[in-house]
């Protein structure tokens, strides 16, 4: 039986927790959605920079140390979070799929994905909530109508909380009407909007990266972005307090996936999917820390429950704020096609271990991707070709990919000692294989099947010569030759024409 947030508040009252008078009404719910942000905050044990606003928020509520996203890329993760369903259950697993146009270019016939379920904003709106999306990030891999999701959208899309800080997001809502909103913070995508503050020579470099100036620049810049993000979070909290909403708002702060560098964004290592989650709200006692496994689709269920209505039976997320909540014994994450790069990986995370199943071992992790033009990517390839990467770094940057990986996360947080072939861990390997097989069967993992010809063709139209995976060969002939030129492999020069 799934309890509502009101039952949760009643339970807390019985336990003696202090509740404000405003908590008797339906609480507001606000998602502080961080883009491309790794959890390098003080409250999560990082001492390199100071993040006072996020740290203060954590002290005011519950900090979740084992929060995992269902994907390491925005559109798949966000499609899951806004529905409470795994992206693989609703056919939203391929990054930026179901798009009728791309950067202003008409895609013609595309693989439309029409859902039979309602999104979280639609559910909340039907329950009487005023809904808004500050920042306008609507990166969903299914067909939807923004007007049905939100009462208010800012006229100008951006990566900061300016509209919310000005009070515009809730200014025109009904009197005493609760709101459900999302505020999108640019995080790792702030670019030059984040001042260069951090000393690059002092940043920590994980062992799976070569220690170079370019790598240090990438890491240092992300720290700069986190400093600016912390400022933005402070502005959001100040606006809630100024307008009298803070005491009756359930705040859920979390990130969609890790920062942009290799092994993090788009991948299922800890840097890609192990993200921050902080819950603050009426009736929630501050200063709590939990090691419970939480999936990003659980945010969806907790949000719906907060409105006082039952969580739909079809929803795969769990209301982790409910007093009868049963902790998960595992969480699942999935990697499928990202941009033009076709990949198929699944991850099972249990309290102690992580199991990775790499299905496409015919291609390395460093197969052609959108990151190839970056100077740091080109440096990685040069170092690899010159034999200047060590064994630890070659696990990811090498030309081979193991079909299975198993890591003891407590002893090996960087995931560099693969235990999959160690006889001592045969039992754990078998256990995690079974968990994955059962999950695939129960959820009907749509990523287990090849992408449709229409989906491949649409991707080929978008990216042209960058589509080098063999899966594209069966549809390549359907486009004019001028539209798809032979791709040049990264690091290889085109042969000179004979005179």
Predicted region positions:
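Polar, surface-exposed loop/tail segments
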Residues: 52, 81, 143-145, 247-249, ...
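A short beta-strand-to-alpha-helix junction
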Residues: 47-51, 68-73, 107-118, 217-231, ...
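Histidine-centered active-site microenvironments of extracellular/periplasmic hydrolases
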Residues: 239-295, 308-316, 333-334, 340, ...
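Long, internal low-complexity/basic segments
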Residues: 23-27, 34, 39, 63, ...
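Active-site segment of extracytoplasmic enzymes that catalyze sulfate/phosphate-ester chemistry
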Residues: 31, 38-116, 123, 129, ...
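C-terminal cap/loop subdomain of S1 sulfatases and analogous C-terminal strand-loop tails that border
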Residues: 307-405, 427
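Active-site His/acidic residue clusters
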Residues: 167-219, 257-267, 280, 423, ...
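A long, amphipathic alpha-helix that forms part
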Residues: 203-249, 259, 277, 284, ...
């Amino acid at each position: 039986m799934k309890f509502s947030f009101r039952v949760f508040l009643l339970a807390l009252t019985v336990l003696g927790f202090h509740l404000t008078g405003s908590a008797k009404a339906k609480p507001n719910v606000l998602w502080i959605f961080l883009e491309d942000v790794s959890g390098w905050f003080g409250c999560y044990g990082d001492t390199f920079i100071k993040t006072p606003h996020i740290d203060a928020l954590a002290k005011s509520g519950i900090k979740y140390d084992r929060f995992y996203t269902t994907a390491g890329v925005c559109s798949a993760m966000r499609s899951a979070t806004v529905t409470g369903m795994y992206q693989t259950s609703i056919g939203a697993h391929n990054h930026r799929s179901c798009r009728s146009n791309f950067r202003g270019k008409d895609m013609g016939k595309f693989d439309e994905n029409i859902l039979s379920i309602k999104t979280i904003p639609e559910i909340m709106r039907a329950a009487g909530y005023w809904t808004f999306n500050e920042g306008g990030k609507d990166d969903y891999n299914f067909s939807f109508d923004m007007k049905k999701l939100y009462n208010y959208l800012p006229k100008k899309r951006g990566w900061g909380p300016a509209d919310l800080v000005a009070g515009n997001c809730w200014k025109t809502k009904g009197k005493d009407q609760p709101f459900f909103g999302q505020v999108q913070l640019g995080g790792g995508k702030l670019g030059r909007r984040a001042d260069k503050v951090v000393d690059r020579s002092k940043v920590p470099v994980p062992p799976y990266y070569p220690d170079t100036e370019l790598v240090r620049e990438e890491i240092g810049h992300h720290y700069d972005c986190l400093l600016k993000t912390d400022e933005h979070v402070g502005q959001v909290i100040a606006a809630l307090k100024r307008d009298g909403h803070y005491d009756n708002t359930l705040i859920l702060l979390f990130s969609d996936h890790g920062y942009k560098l290799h092994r993090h964004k788009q991948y299922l290592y800890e840097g890609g999917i192990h993200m921050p989650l902080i819950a603050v709200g009426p009736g929630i006692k501050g200063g709590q820390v939990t090691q419970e496994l939480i999936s990003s689709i659980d945010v969806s269920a907790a949000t719906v429950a907060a409105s006082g209505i039952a969580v739909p039976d079809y929803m795969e997320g769990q209301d982790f704020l409910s007093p009868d909540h049963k902790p998960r014994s595992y969480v699942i994450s999935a990697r499928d096609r990202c941009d033009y790069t076709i990949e198929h990986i699944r991850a099972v995370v249990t309290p102690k271990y992580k199991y990775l199943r790499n299905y496409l071992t015919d291609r390395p992790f460093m197969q052609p991707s959108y990151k190839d033009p970056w100077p740091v990517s080109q440096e990685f390839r040069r170092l690899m070709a010159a034999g200047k990467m060590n064994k630890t770094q070659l696990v990811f940057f090498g030309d081979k990919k193991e079909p299975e990986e198993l890591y003891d996360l407590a002893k090996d947080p960087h995931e560099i000692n693969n235990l999959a072939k160690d006889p001592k861990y045969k039992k754990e390997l078998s256990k995690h294989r079974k968990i994955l097989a059962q999950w695939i069967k129960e959820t009907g993992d749509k990523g287990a099947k090849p992408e449709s010809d229409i989906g491949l063709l649409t991707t080929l139209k978008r990216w042209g010569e960058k589509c080098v995976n063999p899966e594209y060969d069966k549809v390549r002939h359907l486009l004019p030759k001028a539209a798809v030129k032979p791709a040049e492999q990264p690091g290889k020069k085109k042969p000179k024409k004979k005179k």
